[in-house]
Each structure stands twice: as structure tokens, then as C-alpha cells.
């Protein structure tokens, strides 16, 4: 989220705010806001949107619906801005199927300890974190393994925030130049995956 928020300070980019049926959370001490962090909707609204084909992609993740609406992408297009979003690998797979020229970036921490520290900040209490840990752990393994296997992800190690922001922006604006130029990052990510598996 930090990298995306920095990119969104530029008028070139527009955030594609996803819809979700989960309740707002507190991340790093700040409550999520409707229309900014997500469009928080109930299950019936999600079902209606699905039936009316109002989502570009929608998936069930951890028992919750997450989706990107056609309306959100249309806003970016109408404003002639680069659409950016933060979605899971299932959503990216759908984007790649619908628009193969989409640019997919997988940002990972430098090690498992940093990953756990950052993940804990997403929860209000240690108890909340521990309750979600089994799902998050399994999901991290699945998603990172998948991202390392498919050819369309650019992998970035977020060990230096300013560098990670700069590289992310360069890839978004000049993606073809960077195709498969991330072997070192992929090696770090592969080691991270092995560490996470062994937690």
C-alpha cells in the first residue's frame, strides 16, 4: 500500500478502488475508509454486481468477495490516466487473460521476519493477527509460488522504499524494457518463499 500511495501522488496515475464484502479494518493504526481503501459492500450488492457483469474480475479470498468494477477502470480511461490497483494473484490472472498488455508487479519484503512485522501492522491486536495467521501463511505460500512460476510478473524487493517506488514507476511506464530483468529479485523471492514455508 505504501508504494501505491506514493505513486498516486502523481497525476499520471489513478487508483482503481476494489470492492469487498469484508468489514473495514485498522491498518497501522488508521481505519480503512469507504471509497478510498475499498468500496465496502454487502453480500447482496456483490451478488447483484456479479449477476449484472459489473466486475472486470471478482474472486473469493479468505471467505470474502473482492472485485474490480468496470466503472472504476472506465474512470481511469476517461481521465486518460494509468490505472493501478492492488489485487491478489487470482485477480491478476484474470486481468492478464482479458488484457495481456497489463503490467503485473509482485512486491515482496526482503525476508520473512520483515514480512511478519509488516503483516502484524495490519491487525489491531496480536490476537487478531494470530486468528488470521493460518490463512495468511497458506495464502502467502500459494501466491508467491504462483507469481514465481508465471511469466508476466515483475518481482520487486521492497528493502529500500524509495528505490522500490522508483523501480515500480519505471516498470509501469516502460514495462517492455524490464521484461525478465528481475533475476536477482526472483532469487530473493524464492529464498523468501522457502523461509515462509518453513515458518
Question: Where are the regions a protein language model picked out?
Answer:
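Switch/connector loops and helix/strand junctions flanking conserved nucleotide-binding motifs
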Residues: 25-27, 93-95, 112-118, 163-167
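Short glycine-/polar-rich loops that comprise or flank the Walker A/P-loop
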Residues: 12-13, 98-103, 149-153
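Conserved phosphate-donor/acceptor-positioning beta-strand/loop module used by diverse small-molecule
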Residues: 83-88, 97-121, 157-158
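Glycine-rich phosphate-binding P-loop
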Residues: 1-5
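Small-molecule kinase domains that catalyze NTP-dependent phosphoryl transfer to phosphate-bearing small molecules
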Residues: 127-174, 178-199
Amino acid at each position: 500500500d505504501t508504494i501505491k500511495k506514493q505513486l498516486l501522488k502523481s497525476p499520471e496515475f489513478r487508483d482503481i478502488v476494489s470492492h469487498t464484502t469484508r468489514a473495514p479494518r485498522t491498518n497501522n493504526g488508521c481505519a480503512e475508509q469507504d471509497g478510498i481503501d475499498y468500496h465496502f459492500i454487502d453480500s447482496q450488492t456483490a451478488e447483484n454486481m456479479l449477476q449484472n457483469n459489473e466486475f472486470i474480475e471478482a474472486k473469493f479470498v479468505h471467505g470474502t468477495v473482492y472485485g474490480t468494477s468496470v466503472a472504476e477502470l472506465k474512470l481511469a480511461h476517461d481521465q486518460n490516466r494509468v490505472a493501478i490497483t492492488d489485487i491478489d494473484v487470482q485477480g491478476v490472472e484474470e486481468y492478464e487473460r482479458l488484457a495481456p498488455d497489463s503490467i503485473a508487479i509482485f512486491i515482496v519484503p526482503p525476508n520473512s521476519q520483515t514480512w511478519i512485522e509488516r503483516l502484524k501492522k495490519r491487525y489491531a491486536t496480536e490476537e487478531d493477527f494470530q486468528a488470521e495467521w493460518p490463512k495468511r501463511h497458506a495464502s502467502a505460500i500459494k501466491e508467491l509460488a504462483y507469481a514465481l512460476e508465471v511469466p508476466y510478473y515483475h518481482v520487486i524487493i521492497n528493502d529500500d522504499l524509495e528505490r522500490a517506488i522508483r523501480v515500480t514507476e519505471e516498470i509501469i511506464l516502460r514495462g517492455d524494457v524490464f521484461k525478465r530483468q528481475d533475476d536477482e529479485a526472483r532469487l530473493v523471492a524464492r529464498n523468501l518463499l522457502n523461509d515462509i514455508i518453513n515458518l
